[in-house]
Amino acid sequence: MNNMKRSKKPRVSWPPGPKLCQVKVFRTEDSPANVASQPQRHSYPSRKPRGPDLPPGFEGNHYAVKPNVSNIPRIKWKRPPPKFSVNDTWLVGCGGGSSEWQNENLRISKVLEAIYPHRSAIPSRPSVSPAVEAECFDDSKTPAIRLTPIEDESESSSEESSNSKVESGVTANKQGQLETKPLCSTQEQVSGLTGLAPDLSLAASAALTALMKTKEQGSLVDTELLIKFLSDPKLIKNLITDTSGKSSETKNQPIVTNINSATRPVPQPVSAVTASPMARKPQPVIIPQEHSVAVSRSFTNPERRVSPPKPVNGSISPPKPITGKPSSIPMPVHFHVGIAKEQPQPARFPSSSLPMNLNFHRPPNVFSEPKVIVNPQPQHQPYSAFRTSEMNYVQSSIGLGRGPQTGFNSYPMNFSRADAIGSAKPVVQPMKGLDYFKNLIREHGTDNHETNQYHSQTGIFNGRIDNNNKIHQQCIYFGTANGCNMGDSCTYVHDRYRPNFEAAAPRAKRMKFGRYERNGF
């Protein structure tokens, strides 16, 4: 093997030392002597030379002509500027005596500075002209600026003039009579005012001054009649007392009652009113239209007392008719006298004018204070009774809770068949009791924010989806970390008693060692 390697000849043969030289081959145009003299040739074709990139409007050739800067002569300083030398005897101050401080104050106050075309056009002070400074003005002589246009004022004046002409034609005779005898009228007025009280005299004097003004302007007031009223103090007092007496009579109008001697007067007023059922303390009793009667609110004196309850037949006769006032027809009524407890304000009955025949009886263990209920004489025997306690029991069974047993809820109501046939069946609104609001407060903050809502007439359930319409299958999203987005309106069943395994504490994170072992850690 060594012999074979030694026998091989080298492939490259080098000439001897004196003949050894370096040779480079160039093209004629790429020779070192001609590289910089000729431009380089590119393979892509040559394009047209682009002109200068000028904005529109500057394409003219005159912009390309530039002045020769070398031809402009340079100005040489004849003498250098004097050197600034600081003198130690100078005193530096704040500049209070300078004439520029006023101009500086104007600049500080942001007075606008204008550029004037010539020195002669510059005023002494741009904010105030010298002509205004030289003159002395009196502000009291300044005319007032009109708030309304002249056109509107002319229209209003024309309307007032037309109205005054019409009124002057109507009251010309009355004004003439007053002008002929102004002294006697004023004397009568003064003499009439002397007998009045100080307040009445002041009011009368104010009316007289207004009357004298209206006499000049013209009005439709009968001045003679007004003067006659004001000059008579007795007439003024009678007018005041009559108005106060009428108002007091209309407010407190008693009703004469003929009740058996076995019973004593009643302390608590009760009114049977069909037109105003929303009265507060006197409970409204609805009476059929056949026996409807208006009873005054001040039926009895509240200071009277009542004996133990006894059913007594009595009759109420309204007061005798007064001249100029309507009267009502007397009507027999039944009295059921009892002692009632002090109870809170009852809920108002929704139906205001239902033709019902009500017969109120005393429930056991309810009364502790005297109370009178007025009812008309029933014509027919009641065939069916509708108790509000049963209605409350139905409300509690459907989830609305038992309402407060006060007012109308604490008394049974008897509906006669004649009234039921003659009129439509009364619709009773379900009343929400105290338990309903307690449950609502207790459920606040949970997932169930909806309430049980029932239709007022048909009783259709308008709340959540009924369980009968739901698919009997557990919701896969309920109880998870994200939860069900549908909430109570979900068509699947949400089992609230199912154990929630996702809500448990998170487990410890498991370490993965395979990746570290492969990397050699």
Swiss-Prot record:
InterPro entries: Znf_CCCH. Keywords: DNA-binding, Metal-binding, Zinc, Zinc-finger. Residues 28-60, 142-185, 296-319 are annotated as: Disordered. Residues 34-43, 170-185 have a biased composition (Polar residues). The keyword Repeat does not apply. One of its GO terms (molecular function) is DNA binding. The keyword DNA-binding applies. Residues 159-168 have a biased composition (Low complexity). This is Zinc finger CCCH domain-containing protein 45. It comes from Arabidopsis thaliana. The lineage of its organism: Eukaryota, Viridiplantae, Streptophyta, Embryophyta, Tracheophyta.
